Amino acid sequence: MPAFPTMSNRVEVRVKGTAAGIMNREDLVAGLCLFILLVYCTATIFVKAAWPLQSFQMGVFALLAVYLVTGIRKREEGAAKGVAPLLVYFIPVWGLIQILAHTTTSTFQTREAVLRWGALAAVFFLVQIVVRTPAAREIALHAMLFFATVMALLCLTQLFTSKGLVLWIFPSGYPDVYATFPSYNNYAQFIEISLPIAVWYSLRKGLQSWGYILLAGTLYASVIRAASRAGAALCTAELLAILAMRAIGPLKLNRRETKLRMRSITLVLALVPLVAVTFTFVVGWRRIWQRFQQHDDSYLVRSEFLIPTIDMAVHRPLIGYGLGTFPDVYPQYAIKDFPFYLNSAHNDWAEFAADGGIPFLLLVLIPFAAVVPTAIRHPWGLGLVAVMLHACVDFPFPRPAVSGWLFAMLGLLYVARASDRHEDRFKISPGRHDPPTVLEFKH
């Protein structure tokens, strides 16, 4: 069961005079609607038609419109302040500039990209507005974790029984499916976002954290069984990084967790990887081992995608060829013919530079890079760093079933950063605040 923050007399966090643990009805309903939309987007990713993505976008825009009309004056202080988070809202604007300036090679493709980026920016905004308190953040993190676990169980079950049928009903066109994901890489990216949540909570709760340990083992084993090499490497890195951070103790500077005896901590540090490895042996590790052993040319081929992509960025460094136009423009720069349609550069960062120029690359990169220190301070957010790295060899951003959760995590980290700064101001000048009666929290 989720462990909610306990009362303490150390720090008090207030939002317009409201205790930090309280989540009002408007926030709860809006948060639930947003969660349902993200679940819906993930559940329909296997559908090749446009209507699932379009209906997700319409739902997010409708939710944003309703929330702005009914609550903007009351929620205006919720969104993160500063240049970096503000840049997120300029990402879709860049596509509009390309359309208005007639610099895009395909107005249709750029318009679609603007809608997709606009929906992601709306998710980012809504998460910050809705999940403003530590208690709300706990609920959001646990919702993400439990949905990811359901998807992991579905993935493992289908890999052994479905023979390429999504939910045992819908043909995918592939020999295997990974929950509702046709691509094992996209599935791995989805799990990368949630795995650190399970690992970190398992280490925070000591011997009472067996439930989180099982969840972490399930998530990790599902990625190994899915046989995404980059996903397996990054999930392993996430697991080891959080274990090392907890063992070495660099997080003592912001430790606000329940104090555990050293014996309990040591035991949990041993149990988490043990359970992960055990679950991996149960579901099977040979496939991923074979993929690491095989000497295929997949990464060499990706370098042959990357070189023309960089060439595209060099030719139009300021404005790019238009958001979403890479598949149309790439053949003009290709250094080799391939017997398949290339829909992505398999490096999102390079593709951003090709589609939107260097300014667009910075519009996307800066908001994510700025929050990396917060992800290190709050390890439940390390999945954001993992997906950023995975984007160097694949394409998670064009898939809202992945990037929707990624932008939600981005919003949560900016909320955590604002909370940290509020705390620091409290410590520096406690005399200017009311006597504390509060919520102790450490996420």
Predicted features and spans:
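TM-adjacent membrane-interface loops and short helices in multi-pass inner/ER membrane proteins
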Residues: 183, 303-342, 349-352, 356-362
